[in-house]
A protein has these predicted regions:
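Residue-level recognition of pore/gate-forming positions within transmembrane alpha-helices
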Residues: 58, 91, 120-124, 153-154, ...
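Hydrophobic alpha-helical transmembrane segments of polytopic membrane proteins
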Residues: 87-109, 127-130, 179-188
Length: 203
C-alpha cells in the first residue's frame, strides 16, 4: 500500500500545493484591481517590499502545506519518507520552486480573470506531463521526454531520492533545476510585477 502511494503522492502533493501556494500572489492582482495597492504604498512600504512579502507568504504556505501532508500521510498510511534533515531540505527546495513558478505565472497576467485562466492551464499541463496525475512510467515515451523537463517531475525525483536513501549527488540535477526555477522565476516575477504595478500607479 505505502509503496503504491509513494508512486503517486509526491507528484500529487506538488500539484496540490501549487494551487494552495499561489493564493498570496493572487492577492497582488486583487489589490491592484480593487485599488487597495495605492493605500498600501502610501505607508512606508516600497513596491518591491510589498511583492517580496507576498512571495514570502507563498513560500511559508507551501512549506507548511508540504510538511503537513508528509506528517499526515506518514501517520495515516505508515509511509516512511526518509531521514528528517534531508526531507526538510527537499521541502524547502520544493517551496522555493513553487514560489518562483507561481510568482512568474501571476506576474504574466494583467487581471485576475487572466490569471484564473493561465494558472490552471499551466499547472495542469505540468501535472499531466510530470507524473502528478498518472505514474510517470506509464506515460507514452514521447510524453516522458517532455515530462522530464517539468518541475513536477523534478520534484518527484528529489522526494524519491530521499525516500530511497540515495546520496544527494545522485539527484543533484533535479535539485538544481528546482532551485533555478525558484530563483529565476522569482526574479523575473519581481521585474514584471514592478513594471505592471508601477505603470498602474502612474495612471
Amino acid at each position: 500500500m505505502s509503496e503504491y502511494l509513494l508512486l503517486l503522492l509526491p507528484g500529487a502533493m506538488y500539484f496540490w500545493i501549487l494551487f494552495i501556494g499561489q493564493t498570496p500572489l493572487q492577492e497582488i492582482l486583487q489589490d491592484k484591481e480593487q485599488r487597495i495597492l495605492p493605500r498600501i504604498l502610501a505607508c512606508p512600504v516600497t513596491l518591491g517590499q510589498y511583492v517580496c512579502a507576498k512571495m514570502l507568504r507563498c513560500f511559508v504556505l507551501c512549506s507548511l502545506a508540504a510538511a503537513l501532508l508528509i506528517i499526515v500521510s506518514a501517520l495515516l498510511f505508515g509511509i516512511k519518507w526518509g531521514p528528517a534533515p534531508k526531507l526538510a531540505l527537499v521541502v524547502v527546495i520544493w517551496s522555493v520552486s513553487m514560489t518562483g513558478l507561481t510568482s512568474l505565472i501571476q506576474s504574466l497576467a494583467r487581471t485576475r480573470e487572466q490569471a484564473n485562466v493561465i494558472s490552471p492551464l499551466v499547472l495542469m499541463l505540468f501535472a499531466m506531463l510530470g507524473g502528478s496525475m498518472f505514474p510517470y512510467d506509464n506515460l507514452p515515451k514521447f510524453l516522458q521526454l517532455l515530462g522530464q523537463y517539468t518541475p513536477n517531475r523534478w520534484a518527484v525525483l528529489t522526494m524519491l531520492g530521499v525516500v530511497h536513501s540515495k546520496p544527494m549527488t545522485e539527484f543533484i540535477a533535479p535539485i538544481a533545476a528546482l532551485l533555478a526555477l525558484g530563483i529565476l522565476g522569482s526574479l523575473l516575477a519581481m521585474v514584471f510585477f514592478r513594471r505592471q504595478l508601477g505603470a498602474g500607479q502612474m495612471k
